[in-house]
Amino acid sequence: MKNKFLYIILFSFSFSQFDLDARMLGMSGAYTSIASGYQSMGVNPANLVSNQSLSLNLFSANMFMVNDFLSVDLYNQLNGADFDNTSSTSYYSKNDILGQIKGSNIDIEAGVVAPFPIFNFAYKNFGITTHNKSYSKFHIPDTVLDVMLNGNTKDQRFLLDLGGEFISCNEIGLSYAQKVDYLGFPIYLGYTFKYIQGLAFFKMRDIQQDGSYILTQQTSFHASGKYLVEQAFGGTGTSSDFGLLLPEFYEGWNIGASLINLGGSVKFTSDNPTRQYLGSSFESTSGLRQNEYYYLDFKLDTMSVMTAFDSDVEFFSSNSIKVGIFSDIPLEEDYMPGDILYYTVNSNGDSLINVGESSIDIEDVIDLGNGSYLVPSSGLAGSQLQSTTSKDVNLDYPSSLRLGISKNFDEFGILSIDMVTGFDDSFGNSNKFRLSIATEIDRVSENFPIRIGASFGGRQPSSYSLGFGYKAGPLNFDFGRKYYSGIIRNKAKGAEFALNLSIDLTDFKNYSIKFGIPKINLPKLPKLPI
């Protein structure tokens, strides 16, 4: 039962570099120059030039979850292990456990890509795509596991850098592709314009200078932490995809390139239609208004054996308040009635922050260190939280560059190679190149292609993919799965699964689909005597 629960935790779930469909997943993302039909949108819109008829999505789902620490194999080794007796046959070193952590945190990521049925289609060189992308990530500092294994070491400062993020957006894209000839060479060009509907955004981060911590000394404990939880509902943005394909450019090799989500951004504001339509539901659920966030802090001050049992000594305190974030603070001479904060300059030329709102105590204002300040918001009006100095949530939408080559070998199948890199590290993106190599084998049967692929580099661990397709007339069924950090399930530290059902009417005239009840020959019954 425990193993089944672990499999669910590791493998039941899955931004810019997401695998968008089952075939792409089976090819480990090596898809830039081979994606076809509606599936080329979001990967390389130039491939729409080769679309001869109608291709339509009926159902599709892609989910993944990956971590950088625990696998089923490691769990089985730790389950029942002896961590102290080195002579035990089940001994497992604590240092070896901590050595499994890459960096200073245990990172856990999950995501979902959910295309809306029917509303993803391409007709010849024009296409429409609509889908939801959701991504979450949270990290646990390695010091938590260190304390669990070794206890709190004296005079060692254990950092408590807890944090995470979540974003969910709908994308609606319109694509168009065109073939041009240059010096006798065909060139495919494609473009996609995307409207982005931001549904929800959450982010928790450690804002204490030098980091939140716990410290054990000879006779006492000390701890301190400050965290900010940001949220937003209802955003709007746009982005663009540009694609290029050189079909059979050199000895049958196709060369493709694309820029995905170029110039993309999402801004969450109070006048957004999503916010206006569902704003009351969001506020009643979260208890927060637009541009209002949670500030959390705690402090453990010199707790010892004596103070722990002394009821008159308050050694622990915690707080949770609603705040607004204010930046672009004006100088005193530019101060306008209604401004929350303003700067004055003393005789030494230093800027000092002042409060323009009488209901706020200057001692409660928290400097974030980047020209922004946290201000308690319980006494502020909604209009003040949405003033020119109040900070709106404005996110850069993850964008990436894709480069790919492929070739269709007779009596074998397709070999495809891709290089992908992001322009930032936000929401699952990576600004490091990731190499993907894959093959789609149709030698056994053109109606049953088998896909095998692998990816290396970038921010995520190496991954290994396997998938297949089945064609029944115009109906296409595809399945793909990917394991991270291992080829087999027990060694993997994450997994991704995808299913896809679609229609392709390119060869519709040649299809022969018959529906009927199969003829059943019943055995003859013996004649009864008269």
What does each of the following model-derived ranges do?
Residues 17-25, 122, 126-530:
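Outer-membrane beta-barrel porins/channels
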Residues 3-14:
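Sec-dependent N-terminal signal peptides
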Residues 10-12, 77, 82-85, 196, ...:
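Generic signature of intrinsically disordered, low-complexity, basic-rich segments
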Residues 15-140, 145, 261-266, 504:
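N-terminal, post-signal peptide beta-strand-biased segments of exported outer-membrane/organellar beta-barrel
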Residues 6-8, 27, 198:
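General helical structural elements
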Residues 3-5, 78, 89, 172:
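Intrinsic disorder/low-complexity segments enriched in polar/small residues
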Residues 1-2, 525:
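Generic N-terminal leader/processing signal
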Residues 2-3, 43:
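Residue-level micro-sites within transmembrane alpha helices that shape
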